[in-house]
Design a protein with these regions (language model features):
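Short conserved segment of the HATPase_c
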Residues: 81-93
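Short helix-loop "hinge" at the ATP-lid/N-box region of the Bergerat-fold HATPase_c
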Residues: 48-49
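Short beta-strand/loop element within the Bergerat-fold HATPase_c
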Residues: 55-68
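Acidic ATP/Mg2+-coordinating residue in the GHKL
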Residues: 76
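Conserved catalytic submotifs in the C-terminal HATPase_c
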Residues: 14, 19-28, 65
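Conserved glycine-rich
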Residues: 54, 122-123, 133
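Glycine-rich G1-box
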Residues: 11, 79-80
């Protein structure tokens, strides 16, 4: 699925000179609603393309699995968000930069859709800013 999403956004990635690293294991199969799973990864990808900037990289990896869950990390090396926004990123209609979002046509729903789709699969999602300039969202 992730390979298909990256193929769908190839033009946007090239225009913004974004490098995408799909580090998911070949043949990884996740049980769940395929439309919602697609929505999760597509919205995270679209969000990174729209707001992270140019000349960045996006990395998607499965960093752990157990008998119930896969644990994914979706990160980019873009402009990031301030720590004051982290607790609200997944709220409906929340925008970090209202002017920029309006100009780019964002609705403020993408990450809320992601959160709800993750919850419907019994998981959680959160974002954090590590010591280096990378924005991470984790979901399981």
């Amino acid at each position: 699925m992730m390979r298909n999403i990256l193929n769908e956004v190839t033009l946007e990635l090239e225009e913004k000179q974004i490098t995408a690293h799909n580090m998911l294991p070949e043949g990884l199969t996740v049980q769940g609603n395929s439309s919602l799973l697609y929505s999760i990864f597509r919205n995270l990808t679209d969000n990174a393309i729209a707001y992270a900037g140019t000349h960045i990289s996006i990395t998607i990896r499965c960093f752990r699995e157990d008998e119930r869950f896969y644990y994914f990390s979706f990160s980019d090396t873009g402009v990031g968000v301030g720590p004051e926004h982290l607790s609200r990123l997944f709220e409906r209609f929340y925008r970090v930069d209202k002017g920029r979002s309006r100009k780019l046509g964002g609705t403020g729903l993408g990450l809320a859709i992601v959160k709800n789709a993750v919850i419907l699969h019994g998981g959680t999602i959160f974002a954090k800013i590590p010591p280096v300039e990378v924005w991470n969202s984790y979901l399981h």
